[in-house]
């Protein structure tokens, strides 16, 4: 958030929305998980962020993904911050960016107990 507040266009920001992805103890289908590993396509990530920064009202998008190492339950996986003018624009941009990251940028390997 401090980095966003230093953005030269911060005066246009009316909302900062954050997604913090965490390793949970169960998979989507309910199986117990002991951890996971995430691989990231960095070129595609840059493209996704650049495209979504062009959405109406968006000032900044910042992403950090903890990749290429084993993560355990409770570890942070991803932090995504979207700053923009109004709620509707910021929520739409966060949703679109997150969906694109999950479907086009990252590959997750879960380790089951």
Regions of interest found by a model, annotated:
Residues 1-77, 83-113:
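N-terminal, polar/charged subdomain of small-to-medium soluble alpha/beta proteins
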